Amino acid sequence: MKPFRLYAITGEEFHPGRDVVEVMEEAIQGGVDIIQLRDKTSSKKAVLEKARRLKKLAADYGIPFIVNDHIDVALAVDASGVHVGQDDLPLPEVRKLLGPDKIIGVSTHKLEEALEAEKNGADYIGVGPIFPTNSKADVVDPVTTAYIREVKEHVTIPFVAIGGIKRHNVREVIEAGAEAICVITEIVAARDVKAASQALLAAMEEASQ
């Protein structure tokens, strides 16, 4: 898996009336280099149709396409991989289903979970939520940038910081040791999605100096 910097997750509830593929294409044009379909409410058929279209989009731009949770959908569209949470199918079982070459990401909220994911062969981990977020109703309390520092020190696989990350607070995240961030609303809810992506990347670069 090649390194990525800016990871965008779909959030159709934040751009009513706009097509998800159109929004994600603008995000990619702004510098997003990996995308994930996250849909907890639509029918499986609808999720599959979106996944097909997003897979084609990602392929056209030469970037990975990840499916959140729906392993069957990921297999059906030959996605680059899946992202699973702590309450989803255990990582070793996911690997059996997907095979050795697909990307598997795992959400983690504490160091114990991060180390477990690494031991079980995760390709990357999500680290968060760093800040309070309203894009997920079932999230745990914010883990703060202290968790980024812990992961940076103890975990060797790639990680991506997620949760409430905005242009105004991304410096804290980068200075804590994150090299990649994952966002939903800061990109997909923006009036100008491409510009929002570019602004986040610019803020990350500035913080990295």
From Swiss-Prot:
Q: Where does this protein act, in terms of pathway? A: Cofactor biosynthesis; thiamine diphosphate biosynthesis; thiamine phosphate from 4-amino-2-methyl-5-diphosphomethylpyrimidine and 4-methyl-5-(2-phosphoethyl)-thiazole: step 1/1
Q: State the needed cofactors, names only.
A: Mg(2+)
Q: Which UniProt keywords apply?
A: Magnesium, Metal-binding, Thiamine biosynthesis, Transferase
| GO-annotated molecular function | magnesium ion binding; thiamine-phosphate diphosphorylase activity
Q: Where does Mg(2+) bind?
A: D69, D88
Q: Which reaction does it catalyse?
A: 2-[(2R,5Z)-2-carboxy-4-methylthiazol-5(2H)-ylidene]ethyl phosphate + 4-amino-2-methyl-5-(diphosphooxymethyl)pyrimidine + 2 H(+) = thiamine phosphate + CO2 + diphosphate; 2-(2-carboxy-4-methylthiazol-5-yl)ethyl phosphate + 4-amino-2-methyl-5-(diphosphooxymethyl)pyrimidine + 2 H(+) = thiamine phosphate + CO2 + diphosphate; 4-methyl-5-(2-phosphooxyethyl)-thiazole + 4-amino-2-methyl-5-(diphosphooxymethyl)pyrimidine + H(+) = thiamine phosphate + diphosphate
A Gene Ontology biological process in which this protein takes part is:
thiamine biosynthetic process
- One GO cellular component term, please give it: cytoplasm
Q: Look up keyword Secreted and say if it applies.
A: no
Q: Quote the record's cofactor note.
A: Binds 1 Mg(2+) ion per subunit.
**HAMAP family recorded for this chain?**
TMP_synthase
Protein's job: Condenses 4-methyl-5-(beta-hydroxyethyl)thiazole monophosphate (THZ-P) and 2-methyl-4-amino-5-hydroxymethyl pyrimidine pyrophosphate (HMP-PP) to form thiamine monophosphate (TMP).
What is this protein's name? Thiamine-phosphate synthase
Q: What organism is this sequence from?
A: Shouchella clausii (strain KSM-K16) (Alkalihalobacillus clausii)
